[in-house]
Design a protein with these regions (language model features):
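Short, charged, surface-exposed loops that flank catalytic or proteolytic processing sites
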Residues: 29-32
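Short coil/turn connectors at secondary-structure junctions
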Residues: 3-8, 113, 135-136, 144-147
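Short, glycine-/Ser/Thr-/acidic-enriched flexible segments
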Residues: 26, 120-123, 145-147, 154-157, ...
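A contiguous active-site-proximal alpha/beta segment in oxidoreductase catalytic domains
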Residues: 1-23
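Conserved phosphate/anionic-ligand binding catalytic regions in large, soluble enzymes, centered on
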Residues: 11-18, 52-56, 154-167
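ATP-dependent carboxylate/acyl-activation modules
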Residues: 127-197, 201
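Substrate-binding/catalytic subdomain of NAD(P)-dependent oxidoreductase enzymes
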Residues: 23-24, 34-130, 135-137, 156
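A conserved regulatory-domain signal marking ACT and ACT-like small-molecule sensing domains
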Residues: 168-244
Length: 244
């Protein structure tokens, strides 16, 4: 990797979040999935860092610093967790050909880094979509060897212990980053300069109301990628998926 230029890093960096989402895919509610994760030792008694995306955000910030030589992220670094995801969101994503994943990413745009850590829709055909339960994964895109996929168990006592021991050995050895001499120190892009799309679901049993909402959205150039009946309720799905 030392001879490569890094273009982006993206992945699922919190095993607890992925475990909870996997249980919700099997029909559990968010609260039930969180309790199940805690019972199995995959979530802390106070799970806020896991379920609000903070743990994953810390990890992508560290990875960005190692790979891109970037300083600490700015205040407008997008951080969102999974606590507001519902079973309905999971179901709708599945109907549209996606899975819901908590994705953390840092990629270079116009010589600056765009960083975020948030739930996203991932195509079912994507590598990350197939990884369930407590697995973490990272996709590193480079100019010479292309995309590199790394995956491992990301939650639980043994996985955590292995990570801590690895960090201690790394620090004790005084090892430097493999690209410390060749990397460029890059700054961050301002999120206010970026355009993002979102998934919005409109719940209505009134056809006229739903059509009126769709008309307003279309008048503002917000595209509809699908609409239909789910559980006898009219749904509209507004464009948003996270391109891995």
């Amino acid at each position: 990797l030392a001879g490569n230029k890094f273009l982006s890093i993206k992945g699922m960096l919190n095993g607890t979040s992925n475990f909870i989402i996997s249980q919700m895919e099997n029909g559990m509610s968010f609260d039930e999935s969180l309790s199940f994760a805690q019972e199995n030792g995959y979530a802390e008694a106070d799970p806020v860092y896991d379920i609000e995306g903070i743990d994953a955000a810390h990890k992508i910030a560290i990875l960005s610093n190692i790979i891109f030589g970037s300083p600490l992220p700015p205040d407008n670094f997008l951080i969102e967790g999974i606590s507001k995801i519902t079973k309905e969101d999971i179901h709708i994503a599945e109907k549209l050909g996606f899975t819901v994943k908590h994705i953390s990413s840092a990629d270079i745009r116009d010589g600056k880094i765009l960083m975020r850590s948030n739930p996203a829709l991932v195509k079912k055909t994507d590598y990350l979509s197939s990884l369930k339960n407590v697995r973490n994964a990272l996709v590193i895109d480079t100019d010479l060897v292309g995309k590199i996929h790394i995956s491992s168990i990301g939650a639980g006592g043994e996985a955590t212990a292995a990570g801590v021991i690895s960090d201690i050995v790394h620090l004790a050895s005084g090892l430097k980053s493999f690209n410390a001499q060749s990397r460029e120190d890059l700054d961050y892009r301002d999120l206010t300069d970026e355009f993002f799309s979102y998934l919005v679901t409109v719940h209505s049993t009134n056809e006229n109301t739903n059509n009126h909402i769709q008309k307003i959205l279309e008048e503002h150039n917000i595209s509809i990628i699908n609409s239909g009946l789910i559980n006898n309720v009219k749904q509209s799905y507004i464009t948003y998926y996270y391109e891995i």
